[in-house]
Amino acid sequence: MAKDIYFNEDARKSLLSGIEKLSNAVKVTLGPKGRNVLIDKKFGSPIVTKDGVSVAREIDLENSFENMGAQLLKEVAIKTNDLAGDGTTTATVLAYAIAREGLKNVSSGINPIGIKKGIDHAVALAAEKIRKSAKKITTKEEIAQVASISANNDTSIGEKIAEAMDRVGKDGVITVEESKTFDTTISYVEGMQFDRGYLSPYFSTNKENMSVSFDDTYILICEKKISTIKELLPVLEKVVNTNKPLLIIAEDIEGDALAALVLNSVRGALKVCAIKAPGFGDRRKAMLEDIAILTGGVLVSEELGLTLENVELEQLGQAKSVKVDKDNTTIINTGNREQIRERAELIKKQIEETSSEYDKEKLQERLAKLVGGVAVINVGAVTEVELKEKKHRVEDALSATRAAVEEGVVPGGGSTLIEVAMYLDTVDVSKLSYEEKQGFEIVKRSLEEPMRQIISNAGFESSIYIHQIKTDKKGLGFDAASFKWVNMIESGIIDPAKVTRSALQNAASIAGLLLTTECAITEIKEEKNSAGGNYPMDPGMGMM
């Protein structure tokens, strides 16, 4: 297919035009007085949102060159959202500001490579300043403040997230689901839960809800498939003598082994339940090892020189209680806390080392199952449109809160970026080249843009307020919700440091890419034939 090619100024201007259009659509959502964006969907009701990344994801432009620019900026929003869970609108505003100011300099003949070096230098100093300025958060109230701001100042969502995090811990699993009622509630699952149910309903101890409930339970954790009852007899006899129930977790239990277990359970000779091991392949083995450590048992594996026939009671895991239904198993653990902590540290190290997003997600799931249990936030709303919008906000707030716990918080409302710009004013740039100084200045000016937009969205002229913030003492800022000058930290107007830092770094990365672009190539779109098409006349047909 034929290609269309733009060079130099034409390429950069077209890309900037696309960036500007996406930025204009996203920036109106910034701040407590941010406006809504209405998005038409091909199927179902339109979506109303104030979530920057949701707006960005929906934008595709007709002009191919402009669309490339828009897609570059969309990448900033998505990457920031993936990394920190929030700050997508801030990143978008910063990226457009840096790109716009940078292109003015490139158009006047300044070397873009030098400008980019200056931008990178300023951003590195700014990111370090943000890290050092961060204040660690520890209390439930501080967590609620961060979550509320990320949820567009919805304090009820902030309180729910703080409550869930307080219960399951910062490494615990918190999931967001759609509720079947109008109310937003939290439900908890203590201990470890995984998605494997019993192999036979005849194991049920509660016939009303068809579930198994055991207290003070032995757990046999086996890596291999169990097919014959003969393999199990030695360990079954030992457990029967203790009069305690037994949960068997293995790759699979089938044939006469399963039949014999069901028969003994129905007759009441032995309280027993059998389930398949969670996961697949190497992950299954790792999860079985997790369960063994969680319950203080040993994984029965021939690799370790341990067979079913040789298992002793002290090698079985133990649990305060076990609950099994047709879909899930929950184990309330009694394992050694020190061993559990060491296992958690090992998994954290694996998370840091892996480059696969899928592996990282699965490792985080394992970590959460080990250390904190699971909290489920069930989001309720009156209409489906409101439900989807609210669920988006809860998910964003949850991610931002995790970022805040990880790296701490800084004053919000764009005031931290103003403070960083003032800090950059004090940096000695005498050794930088002229081009690098221009790049450095671009970052300083661009850092004001998020606050300008927040004030503008609130209906005020930003220049007066920006000047006052620069002359007032550190820590003060403009609360766009109440239209007052306040101490941002004391008033709970805070942002996760990771969100602010990631927004700036991702914005500068894409803007620098645009400044150093000399050529843009895209496919020429084929013109579609009109629906009524002109059909060729049959040569054999004469005129009427």
Swiss-Prot record:
Gene Ontology cellular-component annotations: cytoplasm
Under which EC number(s) is this enzyme classified?
5.6.1.7
What is the stated purpose of this protein? Together with its co-chaperonin GroES, plays an essential role in assisting protein folding. The GroEL-GroES system forms a nano-cage that allows encapsulation of the non-native substrate proteins and provides a physical environment optimized to promote and accelerate protein folding.
What's the catalysed reaction?
Answer: ATP + H2O + a folded polypeptide = ADP + phosphate + an unfolded polypeptide
State a single Gene Ontology molecular function: unfolded protein binding
* Family of the protein in this entry: Belongs to the chaperonin (HSP60) family.
Pfam families cross-referenced by the UniProt entry: Cpn60_TCP1
User: Which top-level group of life is the source organism from?
Assistant: Bacteria
Protein's gene: groEL
Signal sequence interval, chain numbering: none
Question: Which key words are in the record?
Answer: ATP-binding, Chaperone, Cytoplasm, Isomerase, Nucleotide-binding, Stress response
Q: What is the organism lineage in this UniProt record?
A: Bacteria, Pseudomonadati, Spirochaetota, Spirochaetia, Spirochaetales
* Binding site residues for ATP: 29-32, 50, 86-90, 413, 479-481, 495
Assembly notes: Forms a cylinder of 14 subunits composed of two heptameric rings stacked back-to-back. Interacts with the co-chaperonin GroES.
Q: Name one GO biological process term.
A: protein refolding
Main localization category: cytoplasm
Do you know which CDD domains this protein is assigned to? GroEL
PANTHER family (alphabetical): 60 KDA HEAT SHOCK PROTEIN, MITOCHONDRIAL
What subcellular compartments does it reside in? Cytoplasm
- Write down the top EC class of this protein: isomerase
- The answer to whether UniProt assigns keyword Metal-binding to this entry is no
Q: Which organism is it from?
A: Borrelia duttonii (strain Ly)
**Name by which UniProt lists this protein:** Chaperonin GroEL
